[in-house]
Amino acid sequence: FICLLSAPYATASLELASGITLNTLNGEVIDNVEDAVFTSGENQLVLDYTGYLSDKGKREFISTVPYIMVVNVPENADVDIDLLSRKYAKIEKNVDRELPIFSISVNGDDAEVVQEVLPPSQGALPYGDIPQLVKDYNKERGLVFDS
């Protein structure tokens, strides 16, 4: 008698456009995007962007605040994340207004994903401990994600 158990992990692949960083996945710090393992179903991501964007023929540097979001990932899915725009003015305006800045697709289809700016902590380094900010965010909202 052989009993086979399968873990509820999706063997999804994740592609991040240049400059996009995955800070945490389901509350766990991700040092290398290749190590990111999605669970089948809802996954909580914290992303930010650091790099150069086009601004009236010049290149302007921008480093965004982290955004938190939940993406529904079926098994064996391909998840692609890019910026909504490569225009500095558009991304800067959206960050200032706390509007979405990322474009997310699952298996080639645009995913409807609510993106929020991760609430900062008080003090000199408002995003110095992103995993703790995610824990606080989830606790306040009664959210639980498997890692």
Which residues make up each language-model segment?
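Sec-dependent N-terminal signal peptides
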Residues: F1-I2
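N-terminal signal peptide c-region/cleavage motif recognized by signal peptidases
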Residues: L5-P8
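Short loop/turn and low-complexity linker motifs enriched in small/turn-promoting residues
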Residues: T11-F38, Q44-S147
